[in-house]
């Protein structure tokens, strides 16, 4: 049991955690473990406060192991942002810097990017979807596919068929993600 856990109430812990999160730089993130070590407060209590801050839209969480918490950039301006989707270029690069075994990356080499994307998201415990929109005339439509991983939108891709658009969007997304992953040999 930590010393501060006995003497500090939830409101004080909430303000301490909020202060720590709001002091993060643009490309920084934190975890409940690091906050617990820094503040000398029980990790369970830190997690409770982080989830309260998430409901307030003060912090964003990317599910990983352990979850990574970062400041909601709209809090700097005092504005609230209704959309739960963020563009990839507004998210720090380290959010997708997971450690992936070398064998897994070699196995992914010749696979369809949609399959690779699915396996990556299963491996990192993230949810994902592909949003497809249609444009153009009905006799020659163009399809735009956008991959969304844990609420983060990646660059869209265009195709003449839905399958081609999904393939292109998955390829672009996996290329971006594989550039930032840490390979474990």
Swiss-Prot record:
Description of its domains: The Z-binding domain recognizes and binds Z-nucleic acid structures.
Domain (DRBM): residue spans on this chain: 112-179
Taxonomy, superkingdom: Viruses
SMART domains, per the entry: DSRM (SM00358)
Name assigned to this protein: Protein E3 homolog
Keyword entries, A-Z: Host-virus interaction, Inhibition of host innate immune response by virus, Inhibition of host interferon signaling pathway by virus, Inhibition of host IRF3 by virus, Inhibition of host IRF7 by virus, Inhibition of host PKR by virus, Inhibition of host RLR pathway by virus, Interferon antiviral system evasion, Modulation of host cell apoptosis by virus, RNA-binding, Viral immunoevasion
Domain Z-binding: 7-73
One Pfam family it belongs to: dsrm
Family of the protein in this entry: Belongs to the poxviridae E3 protein family.
MF (Gene Ontology): double-stranded RNA adenosine deaminase activity; protein serine/threonine kinase inhibitor activity; RNA binding
Residues spanning the signal sequence: none
Alphabetical GO biological process terms: symbiont-mediated perturbation of host apoptosis; symbiont-mediated suppression of host cytoplasmic pattern recognition receptor signaling pathway via inhibition of IRF3 activity; symbiont-mediated suppression of host cytoplasmic pattern recognition receptor signaling pathway via inhibition of IRF7 activity; symbiont-mediated suppression of host PKR/eIFalpha signaling; symbiont-mediated suppression of host type I interferon-mediated signaling pathway
Function: RNA-binding protein that plays a role in the inhibition of multiple cellular antiviral responses activated by double-stranded RNA (dsRNA), such as inhibition of PKR activation, necroptosis, and IFN-mediated antiviral activities. Recognizes and binds Z-RNA structures via its Z-binding domain and dsRNA via its DRBM domain: RNA-binding activity is required to escape host ZBP1-dependent necroptosis.
């Amino acid at each position: 049991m930590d010393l501060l856990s006995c003497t500090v109430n939830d409101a004080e812990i909430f303000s301490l955690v909020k202060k720590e999160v709001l002091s993060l730089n643009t490309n920084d993130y934190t975890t409940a473990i690091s906050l617990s070590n820094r503040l000398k407060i029980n990790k369970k209590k830190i997690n409770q406060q982080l989830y309260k801050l998430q409901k307030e839209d003060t912090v964003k969480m990317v599910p990983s192991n352990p979850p990574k918490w970062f400041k909601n950039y709209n809090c700097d301006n005092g504005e609230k942002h209704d959309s739960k989707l963020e563009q990839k270029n507004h998210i720090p690069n380290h959010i997708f810097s997971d450690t992936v075994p070398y064998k897994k990356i070699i196995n992914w080499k010749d696979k369809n990017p949609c399959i690779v994307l699915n396996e990556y998201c299963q491996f990192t415990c993230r949810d994902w979807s592909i949003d497809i929109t249609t444009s153009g005339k009905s006799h020659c439509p163009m399809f735009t596919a956008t991959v969304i991983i844990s609420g983060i939108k990646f660059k869209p891709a265009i195709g003449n068929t839905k399958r081609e658009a999904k393939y292109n969007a998955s390829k672009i997304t996996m290329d971006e993600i594989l550039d930032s992953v840490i390979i474990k040999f």
